[in-house]
């Protein structure tokens, strides 16, 4: 029985790894400003740690519970979303350029020119 259970666990683990790999492949990198605007300008970005909204005029606003509201500017540069916000750590280091990836109504941002921490947000129409 142990042998059968071990085989089942191995098969389950293999399936989970394959499913995870397939899910990771579903993310598509956003490489143009036009694609970024079509996807992420207008909707509210809902992160587990707060919200953000990017506007067509190059401004952005957001809110992080415990820290408050923030605002700033953004531009598309070198296939990345670059933002400068007047809010704690970002302001201390200036621009933060992020790689943007999309999967359905979700986006994944990776900070520090794609070398930093990644966060996932759900895009929802503004109420």
Identify the function of each model-found stretch:
Residues 9-17:
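Bacterial N-terminal signal peptides
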Residues 7, 19-127:
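Lipid interaction determinants
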Residues 1-10:
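Bacterial N-terminal signal peptides that target proteins for export
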């Amino acid at each position: 029985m142990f042998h059968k259970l071990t085989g089942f666990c191995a098969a389950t683990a293999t399936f989970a790894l394959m499913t995870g790999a397939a899910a990771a492949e579903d993310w598509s990198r956003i490489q143009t400003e036009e694609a970024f605007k079509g996807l992420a300008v207008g909707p509210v970005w809902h992160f587990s740690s707060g919200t953000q909204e990017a506007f067509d005029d190059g401004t952005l606003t957001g809110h992080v519970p415990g820290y408050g509201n923030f605002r700033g500017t953004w531009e598309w540069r070198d296939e990345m979303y670059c933002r400068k916000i007047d809010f704690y750590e970002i302001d201390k280091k200036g621009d933060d350029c992020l790689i943007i990836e999309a999967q359905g109504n979700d986006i994944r941002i990776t900070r520090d020119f794609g070398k930093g921490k990644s966060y996932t947000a759900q895009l929802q129409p503004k109420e």
